[in-house]
Structure formats: structure tokens, C-alpha cells
């Protein structure tokens, strides 16, 4: 609502820089197209919807420009797949495909065309018309031009490169499984099994496969469904086996913090080791069986730690500001290889600032865990990652984006050749030359099998290599991306800096092409006499004497988030509506909302006010409300039901999946019968004839659990439940006493990608002197029909039991009843009582995937869902 951006930091500075730049591009687009406010979308003042490929693609392009991973994705598309149209770019391809389109556009027209396109989209309030006006091409023409560009760019790269399936044995098939990720392989020491992270069921789970055939042995862990495995670290993965092949260690988010899980492969039992760190990633089990190396993030850095299982204690073995990742042990268990952006800073304290350090390039390092000495293994201009130590020879395998493709490298660690008896120069070399790219190699103890994750066919799969130590050096030719870098540099740059201090003397008379005509940008058009381009751009009261920015205390300031309205019609309360306003501060610590209809006097209007204090783990809410409803009871009389009170609630989360809500509410219901009379002037007016009031306090507590996954039309997998207890202790004018417990339980089973079975059970019970009624039957907003009510014939078109004139418990039935629905085939309130139970069963399925009509009109229908229920 406020165009706010929250940045996660997990100890990796390059990742942090990328996220900041990426999200700020979104903020810029939201500000430029939508005025920086969700309200403009809600109120339809901004009718345009920026395509996801245009939005995410630009954020990726401006934050990363172009890199080997993006190049890998598009090379795979150009070679292996049907190239999608721009309208078909969604999901993962919205990011990389959109990034490629922006690279094509800026390469052909210049970066200035980015602003032209978004200005045109905003003027026309149509995304395709915006592109057409700025580029002279509609989406169909843009697709054709982009496809030609992809062919010219990537078809030359095919020559002399090996498709993954030709140079290795494929163990998984993401197309058959209809998933995207099969990553983070961990080969058991004996080479018989491989563990991996996979998203086959829409979650990230850990599976165990046969390392020879790829056949699944078992699903070891279900991720994203429980508190202990709330999140498996798939962005920085790391699975590792114990030396005896019996257990696996994995880092995961469990509730409030990250932990190490040690899982017995046979029994699936898990032991959790809690660590006082902000983040835990990439665990690796030592050959001695007692130590586990992992990446720990604390504050502003990530370091390598070792956890002693026997002592249940962790110690830090690197301690600096640099980003360290992917630790791996040597066969003796006395050295660890890891990835770092430290450059030449291997010993001693780093005295500089990280923003002056090149943290975008990574190399391989080793550290002796006994003396803490760090040695640099690689020193190239390329990025190296995912080291794995050979067990039978002094060699190291790792991946590198050498010449634009992520390949597997071998690096000898000693310069003595046992065959010749001579010393040789240590030289790393590629042992694969793949077409797309590979990552995350893992070795068996005898070094006879190496398994890695490779990208091909718009997805990741596991591949196996035999006898990797015997593989010869490969020649990896540079890609077109690398070759063209020398001529057309694609580095990230500050595109505004040249505009901050233009040399006016160099301008031709009357040329204002580089001027910025906008309020607040006057200084961009003035020459600066000194070399510090930024001095005049910084407000003088923002800096200290040493040049650092002055920290300022945060001040709470409320601004409007959204204004909306609603109109609804009920057979009980008639027509009603309300205008809703919501305010919050920039940090989201405080929230104020109120709504009103204000069509009559204060006494006869609907309104509410709510304040939420959301700064800490516990959320506090305070609400005051009033609803006034009028009913025509006969030709000369109206009934006014006025319901007003206050409510307080505390929401206490225990994890991502469950919370406890508790509080109390104070209710006052005023019943007034208004009779039509004539005043002294002969005018009609209403006069109160009968008045009585209900007043009660209702403490309540609810336990909520929800790990469901939503699809396009609702939950498709998981479990949801809400169990609540409400008590009326008898305080108030009517001494209303009851205790009600109810539970709503829902379970969803996902069958493949398209089918879901849903079961829902509802049960409720009320006891006490004034026990509540449960109304059973009907569905919300569909309440017509004849038949019987509680066994009594009732041929009326509508069931209005709670408004029957002879109903002695009128107010109690309206304001203190519970509804058990949906019960299709029955009318609203067809059964009522103090105990209720309801069971629903549904099968959800794709009804029409695609239907094109030619007569009487050319129309296309698609993605229409259906369900069968009982």
C-alpha cells in the first residue's frame, strides 16, 4: 500500500545488492505507473496492469544486467524448447525471459527506451499499446524480433558443446514429474543412494533415490508443512550423509530460528540441534562422524562454523565480514574447502569497507581447522562455487562460469606427479563442456561416482558421471555473451551520474537534451567546480563533519493506505454498505482503520474503529463498533436493532502455521419498535413504542493451524483447522449464560498437478442456561426454497425463522447464533439446535482446459475448473 520494500540479508553481500536493486526497480515502476499507491489500482484510476515479464524482467535486467546464469536459461530455450511468445512468459520464465527481452530492446534502441515504454504504457493505460507506441511493434511483432535475436545469439554456441544427457546419465526427469527443481544432490559414502531436494508436489521435500537407476526409494522429509521443517534452504542448499550411510544432516528453518536436523534414513526420526544464529545453511558432515561444518549468519556476515555433536556446541572457524559458503571436508577431516568473496584477504583483519570491496566475484579457499590458516585455491576473474574434495587423490572438484558456461573443473592440490616423479605447475582445468550449465557436484567415498544438478529443458535434474578423476581436459570456447563483452560492455553502471554534473560548455547552443526538467532536480543541470559530483545534491543538514550521514530517530507518522467501499444484500438485514479507510505508519507497527455509512444520525448509522499494535510478536487489536438495522414488521411499524460494543483481541503466533487468538467482546443490543404516528403538523414520524436491551461480555479463545497451499481458486493441499471456545459468564443486564465450543477442520489432498480431494468436518456444541443455537443448511447468499423446517412443513420461498413474529428469542437468534454451512440442497436455517455436525466432501478438477468456438462468435474459453460435491 505504501510502496514499501523489505530486504532480507542472509550474509551474502552480492545477493543483498541484487535484492536491493531488484526490489527498488519494482518500487520505481509502482511509483511511475501506479503513483506509488495501491489505492489507484483499487479505485481503477490506474487501469493498466504491467505484465509480469515486463515488471520482473526489468528488475532482473537492471539489477544483474546479464550473467552466465541468465545466459544459460535463454540458451536452453533457444536450443531445446519451443521459444515462447512474450505473452507466454510466466513463472520462472517471467524473470529470465523478461530479462532477455529488455536486453534485446536496450541493445537495439538504447536504455532510454525503457522510460519511453513505461511513459507510453501510462499514457495509454494499456501495456501492449504502450509497447507499440514506443517501439512501433505489437506483441506479435516483438515476439518475432526477439526470437530472431535469440537464434543469432545462441545458435552459434551449440557447436562443440555437449548436451547434458549425452555426456552423463540422467537420474531424474522433471518433465515427467512435472516439476522444476531436482537439486542439492548428496551421494551416500558407499555410492548406493543419493538424497536431493525436489519440488515434485509443490513443496520442497527430501527424497532418497537409487544412485544407479534414479528410482525413488522413499520420501524422507516433507518440507513446508510443519514447524520443524518450515523452510528447507533451497537457495543455499546442503545435504550431507554421515560416514556410516545411516543419517543425513540438513539445515532448516524451525519456528523462530534456523536449526540443524539429523535424520535417520531408515526410521525417518529427526533430532534437532538449535543454534543461536540468525541463519544456518549448507551443512557438511565430517569423516570423523562427530563434527558438522555449516554456514552460520550472525549480524552482518556469514562464516564457517563446526558443530560438535557429542558436546552439542558450535565454534566459529572463520570470523570476518566476508561471505563464506558451501563448506566441504577433505578425507582426513582436518581441512575444509569453501567459497568466499574475500579476494586476497586470507589472513588478518579487513580494514576497509565492504562497499569498496569487489564482493561480486567468488573463489575457492581452504582452511585448516587446527591452526585456522586460510589458503586461496583459485584466483581467476571467473566465479567458482560448490567445491567437493576427492577422497583418493589430492584434487578438488568445483564448478566455474569460465567463458560463460557453468562447467565442472578439477584442481590438483599438489604439484608432484607420481607417474613421472617430477614437480609440475598446478593448473586447474575443465573436465566438462556442457551446452547449458551444471552445479552442486557430490562424490562417493571411492571417487567412482559423481552426481551433479544440471539445467536443461527449463528445469533442473540430477546427472551421474562415472570415474570423474579419469576425465580429460576439455576445451570450453567462450559464448557469444563473453565474446561480445569486449565490444559492448554489459556491466552494471550508474546511468544518472553523467547527468548530475553536465559540462555546459560542451553543449551546443540551445541543446537541452540532457537536462532534467523536474522540480527538485535543478542541481542536475548546473556545473560543479570541484570533483565531488554529489556534494550539491546532498542536503547540508544530512551529514556529520566526517562525511557520514546523521542518524535520526524514527517518528510515527500515519498515511492513508486504502479507501474502499462495499454493498451487500441479506435476507436478514437487508441492504447495507460501508466506506472503509485504512491508515498505517511506514514500518507497519501501527494500523488504524475505520468505516462508516453515515446516511442517518449517529444513533442510526453503521460505523467501526479499529487500532492495531503490530510492532512485536504479539499483535494487539482494539475495536469499537455499531450496526443499526431497520425491519418493516407491519404496515405502520418498524423495528430498529442497534448493536454496539467494543472488542479486544491478542494474536499470538507460535510459528508460520499456528497461532492462538484470545480476547473478549462487550455487546449491547437495543431492540426498539417504532410506530408511525402523526405529529401536530400532520406529518408522519416514528415514535418508540417498545424498547428492551441485551448486554453481555463474551470472552473467547481460538486455536488456528493452517499449512495449506493455495491454487487459483482456493486451497489445493494441506490442512486447516480453527477450534474456538466462547463463554458468556452471565455479566450484563440479561445474565446471558452459555459455553460454546466449535471446530472447523479441513484437509486437502493434491492428486498430481490438477486434481484435489477436499474433506471438511464441522462440529459444534453449546451448553448452559441460554445455550446458543446452530442453524444448519444452505450456502451463504443463496437462501431461497420451500420445504420443511425442523420437520414442520414450510412452503415459503424464504426461511425467516430468526425474524418470525412469534419468536421469543429474536435477539438471541440474530446476534448469538452459529451458522453451519455450506449444506447444498437445503435452505438457510432448515435445521437448528444446540448441537451441530456437518461433513463436506469435494473433488476438484479441470473442467475445460481450452475451448475455441467459431460460431456464432469467435470465443476462447480456458482454465475453467469444476468440482463434484456431497
Cite the ranges covered by each PLM segment.
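Active-site-proximal alpha-helical
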Residues: 29, 50-70, 75-140
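Outer-membrane beta-barrel translocator/channel fold
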Residues: 347, 435, 439, 459, ...
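Zinc-dependent metallopeptidase catalytic helix centered on the HExxH motif
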Residues: 2-69, 75, 115
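Blade-terminus and WD-like Trp-Asp/Gly-His loop motifs, strongest in beta-propeller folds
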Residues: 185-193, 239-247, 283-291, 327-335, ...
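A flexible loop/linker signature enriched in serine peptidases of the S9 family
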Residues: 72, 76, 178-180, 197-207, ...
Amino acid at each position: 500500500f505504501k510502496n514499501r520494500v523489505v530486504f532480507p540479508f542472509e550474509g551474502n553481500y552480492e545477493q543483498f545488492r541484487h535484492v536491493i536493486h531488484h526490489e527498488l526497480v519494482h518500487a520505481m515502476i509502482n511509483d511511475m505507473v501506479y503513483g506509488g499507491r495501491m489505492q489507484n489500482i483499487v479505485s481503477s484510476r490506474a487501469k493498466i496492469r504491467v505484465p509480469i515479464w515486463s515488471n520482473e524482467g526489468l528488475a532482473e535486467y537492471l539489477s544483474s544486467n546479464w550473467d552466465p546464469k541468465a545466459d544459460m536459461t535463454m540458451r536452453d530455450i533457444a536450443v531445446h524448447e519451443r521459444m515462447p511468445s512474450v505473452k507466454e512468459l510466466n513463472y520462472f520464465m517471467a524473470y529470465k525471459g523478461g530479462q532477455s527481452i529488455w536486453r534485446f530492446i536496450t541493445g537495439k534502441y538504447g536504455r532510454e527506451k525503457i522510460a519511453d515504454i513505461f511513459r507510453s504504457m501510462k499514457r495509454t493505460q494499456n501495456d501492449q499499446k504502450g509497447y507499440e507506441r514506443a517501439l512501433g511493434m505489437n506483441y506479435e511483432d516483438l515476439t518475432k524480433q526477439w526470437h530472431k535475436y535469440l537464434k543469432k545469439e545462441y545458435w552459434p554456441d551449440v557447436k562443440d558443446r555437449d548436451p547434458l544427457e549425452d555426456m552423463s546419465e540422467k537420474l531424474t526427469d522433471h518433465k515427467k514429474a512435472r516439476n522444476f527443481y531436482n537439486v542439492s544432490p548428496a551421494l551416500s559414502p558407499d555410492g548406493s543412494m543419493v538424497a536431493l531436494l525436489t519440488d515434485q508436489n509443490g513443496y520442497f521435500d527430501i527424497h532418497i533415490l537409487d544412485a544407479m537407476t534414479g528410482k525413488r526409494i522413499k520420501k524422507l522429509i516433507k518440507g513446508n508443512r510443519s514447524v520443524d521443517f518450515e523452510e528447507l534452504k533451497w537457495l543455499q542448499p546442503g545435504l550431507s550423509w554421515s560416514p556410516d550411510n545411516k543419517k543425513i544432516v540438513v539445515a532448516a528453518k524451525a519456528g523462530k530460528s534456523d536449526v540443524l536436523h539429523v535424520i535417520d534414513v531408515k526410521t525417518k526420526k529427526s533430532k534437532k540441534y538449535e543454534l543461536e544464529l540468525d541463519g544456518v545453511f549448507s551443512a557438511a558432515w565430517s569423516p570423523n562422524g562427530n563434527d558438522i561444518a555449516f554456514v552460520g549468519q550472525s549480524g552482518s556476515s556469514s562464516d564457517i562454523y563446526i558443530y560438535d555433536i557429542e558436546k552439542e556446541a558450535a565454534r566459529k572457524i572463520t570470523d570476518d565480514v566476508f561471505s563464506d559458503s558451501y563448506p566441504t571436508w577433505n578425507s582426513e577431516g582436518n581441512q575444509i574447502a569453501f567459497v568466499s568473496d574475500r579476494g586476497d584477504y586470507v589472513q588478518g583483519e579487513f580494514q576497509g569497507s565492504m562497499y569498496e570491496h569487489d564482493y561480486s566475484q567468488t573463489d575457492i579457499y581452504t582452511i585448516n581447522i587446527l591452526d585456522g590458516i586460510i589458503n586461496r585455491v583459485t584466483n581467476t576473474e571467473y566465479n567458482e562455487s560448490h567445491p567437493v574434495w576427492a577422497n583418493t587423490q589430492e584434487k578438488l572438484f568445483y564448478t566455474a562460469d569460465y567463458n560463460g558456461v557453468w562447467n565442472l573443473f578439477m584442481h590438483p592440490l599438489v604439484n608432484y606427479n607420481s607417474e613421472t616423479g617430477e614437480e609440475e605447475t598446478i593448473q586447474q582445468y575443465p573436465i566438462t563442456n556442457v551446452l547449458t550449465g551444471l552445479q552442486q557436484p557430490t562424490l562417493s567415498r571411492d571417487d567412482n561416482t559423481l552426481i551433479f544438478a544440471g539445467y536443461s529443458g527449463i528445469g533442473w535434474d540430477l546427472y551421474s558421471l562415472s570415474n570423474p578423476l579419469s576425465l580429460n581436459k576439455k576445451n570450453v570456447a567462450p559464448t557469444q555473451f563473453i565474446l561480445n563483452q569486449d565490444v559492448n560492455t554489459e556491466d552494471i553502471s550508474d546511468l544518472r551520474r553523467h547527468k548530475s554534473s553536465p559540462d555546459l560548455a560542451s553543449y551546443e547552443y540551445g541543446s537541452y537534451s540532457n537536462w532534467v526538467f523536474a522540480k527538485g532536480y535543478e542541481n542536475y543541470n548546473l556545473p560543479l567546480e570541484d570533483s565531488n559530483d554529489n556534494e550539491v545534491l546532498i542536503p547540508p543538514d544530512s551529514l556529520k563533519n566526517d562525511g557520514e550521514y546523521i542518524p535520526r530517530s524514527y517518528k510515527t507518522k500515519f498515511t492513508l493506505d486504502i479507501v474502499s467501499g462495499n454493498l451487500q444484500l441479506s435476507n436478514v438485514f437487508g441492504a447495507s454498505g460501508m466506506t472503509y479507510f485504512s491508515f498505517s505508519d511506514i514500518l507497519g507497527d501501527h494500523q488504524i482503520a475505520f468505516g462508516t455509512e453515515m446516511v442517518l444520525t449517529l444513533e442510526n448509522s453503521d460505523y467501526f474503529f479499529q487500532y492495531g499494535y503490530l510492532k512485536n510478536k504479539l499483535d494487539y487489536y482494539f475495536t469499537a463498533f455499531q450496526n443499526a438495522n431497520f425491519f418493516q414488521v407491519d404496515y405502520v411499524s418498524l423495528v430498529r436493532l442497534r448493536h454496539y460494543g467494543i472488542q479486544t483481541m491478542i494474536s499470538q503466533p507460535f510459528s508460520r502455521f499456528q497461532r492462538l487468538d484470545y480476547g473478549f467482546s462487550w455487546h449491547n443490543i437495543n431492540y426498539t419498535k417504532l410506530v408511525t404516528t402523526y405529529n401536530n403538523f400532520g406529518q408522519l414520524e416514528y415514535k418508540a413504542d417498545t424498547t428492551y436491551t441485551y448486554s453481555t461480555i463474551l470472552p473467547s479463545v481460538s486455536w488456528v493451524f493452517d499449512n495449506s497451499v493455495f491454487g487459483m481458486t482456493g486451497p489445493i493441499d494441506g490442512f486447516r483447522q480453527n477450534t474456538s471456545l466462547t463463554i458468556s459468564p452471565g455479566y450484563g443486564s440479561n445474565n446471558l449464560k452459555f459455553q460454546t465450543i466449535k471446530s472447523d477442520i479441513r484437509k486437502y489432498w493434491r492428486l498430481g498437478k490438477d486434481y484435489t480431494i477436499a474433506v471438511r468436518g464441522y462440529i459444534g456444541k453449546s451448553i448452559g442456561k441460554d445455550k446458543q443455537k446452530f442453524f444448519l443448511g444452505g450456502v451463504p447468499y443463496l437462501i431461497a426454497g420451500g420445504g420443511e423446517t425442523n420437520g414442520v412443513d414450510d412452503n415459503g420461498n424464504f426461511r425467516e425463522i430468526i425474524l418470525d413474529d412469534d419468536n421469543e428469542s429474536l435477539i438471541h437468534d440474530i446476534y448469538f447464533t452459529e451458522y453451519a454451512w455450506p449444506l447444498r440442497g437445503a435452505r438457510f436455517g432448515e435445521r437448528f439446535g444446540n448441537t451441530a455436525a456437518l461433513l463436506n466432501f469435494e473433488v476438484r478438477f479441470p473442467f475445460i482446459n481450452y475451448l475455441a468456438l467459431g460460431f456464432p462468435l469467435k470465443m476462447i474459453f480456458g482454465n475453467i475448473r469444476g468440482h463434484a460435491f456431497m
